[in-house]
Amino acid sequence: GALSGPVIGGILTIVGFGSFGKHLFNCMPIMVGATFMSYITEHTTQEPAILIAILFSTTLAPIAGRYGTLVGIIAGAIHLTLVVNVGFLHGGVNLYNNGFAGGLVAGMMVPILEAIHVHRVARLNPQRPEVDPAEEVETLS
């Protein structure tokens, strides 16, 4: 697609958040999933709105960093699907679309993934004491 102002802004946003732990290995699975979803739907990566959505989908990079590449690809695909379908809620403003869609994806996936992760860790390491995720959250506050 064209290298326009919003696309450059998206690239600079990714670079800026690099100081907070966003890097190639947790951004690429998300972007691959979003790009894959754009190819199997009627949207093309030449559209500026889709390019911006793919760039801002890296808001889900912590999910790929914690739960792995496959989960990151799935999160990116779900993110792009939501971005193109929730635009009517706030007049098509892409930044709001991406933030809202990222929040929905994280809100849906993280509790499920955390429950699976806790049980998987307990199964792989039987000597480790059982941990309740709710108690872990309570101790953080």
Predicted regions and their residues:
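Transmembrane helical cores of multi-pass ion-transport proteins
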Residues: P129-E130
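Catalytic phosphate/metal-binding cores of nucleic-acid and nucleotide-processing enzymes, i.e., regions
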Residues: N125
